[in-house]
């Protein structure tokens, strides 16, 4: 192939129509560096084929993978779970699946708003209740969908910016893989500004499987 790397790769993917694209992704010390000019990021923005981003981290030596599945209640999350069901053998016989969903820090957000405009304060208990409701909404369809394909997942509630929280958890818990659904983008800018998947791909140390 001759030409701009990202454009040529996306063009070849469209012509060949593979079931999966595997790409190496260099680790970055600064998220902005990945967002600015990354071939990997441009391919994520330009193709609708599942993409596996592989890091320098060695492949797991055992069959018992720890797999995090990031969900947000959308159809894209269900598509990722559907892909897992169709390709279950790729994860091995002893894989441990965790459903990850991040909710905003409702209490901190309300305290900031209250300080700005003298609004009534909200108790931590009320904030906790709201966050749990958001979490249950995000996982309501994902958990039964996983159970339907023979997976009994553990649900993990995270708090904070979704991309940051998921990547932070994956790194802290040393997950072997994170799987997530993502909608396509019509241009690179929208991917940079709007994609949780892009954020996770930038910050997580483990491989990331992104399903369209």
Regions found by a protein language model. Name each.
Residues 24, 51-56, 210-212:
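Short beta-strand elements of ligand-binding domains
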Residues 23-42, 62-64, 177-203:
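Glycine-rich, Arg-bearing micro-motifs that act as flexible, cationic patches
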Residues 120-134:
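A short acidic, glycine-rich active-site loop
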Residues 40-58:
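Short, structured interface segments
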Residues 64-122, 144-151:
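Small/aliphatic-rich secondary-structure junction motif
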Residues 1-21, 144-178:
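Structural beta-alpha unit
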Residues 1, 52, 98-100, 154-158, ...:
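General small-molecule cofactor/ligand-binding pocket signal
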């Amino acid at each position: 192939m001759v030409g701009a790397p990202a454009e040529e790769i996306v063009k070849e993917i469209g012509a060949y129509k593979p079931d999966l694209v595997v790409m190496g992704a260099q680790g970055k010390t600064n998220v902005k560096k990945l967002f600015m000019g990354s071939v990997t990021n441009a391919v994520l923005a330009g193709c609708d084929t599942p993409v596996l981003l592989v890091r320098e981290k060695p492949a797991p030596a055992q069959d018992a993978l720890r797999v995090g599945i990031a969900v947000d209640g959308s159809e894209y999350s269900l598509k990722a779970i559907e892909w897992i069901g169709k390709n279950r053998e790729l994860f091995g016989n002893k894989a441990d699946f965790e459903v990850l969903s991040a909710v905003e820090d409702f209490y901190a957000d309300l305290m900031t708003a209250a300080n700005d405009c003298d609004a009534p304060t909200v108790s931590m208990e009320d904030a906790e209740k709201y966050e749990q409701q958001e979490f249950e909404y995000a996982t309501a369809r994902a958990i039964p969908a996983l159970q339907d394909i023979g997976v009994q997942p553990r649900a993990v509630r995270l708090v904070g910016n979704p991309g940051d929280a998921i990547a932070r958890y994956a790194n802290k818990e040393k997950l072997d893989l994170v799987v997530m659904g993502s909608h396509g983008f019509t241009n690179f800018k929208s991917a940079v500004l709007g994609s949780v998947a892009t954020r996770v791909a930038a910050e997580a140390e483990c491989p990331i499987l992104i399903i369209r």
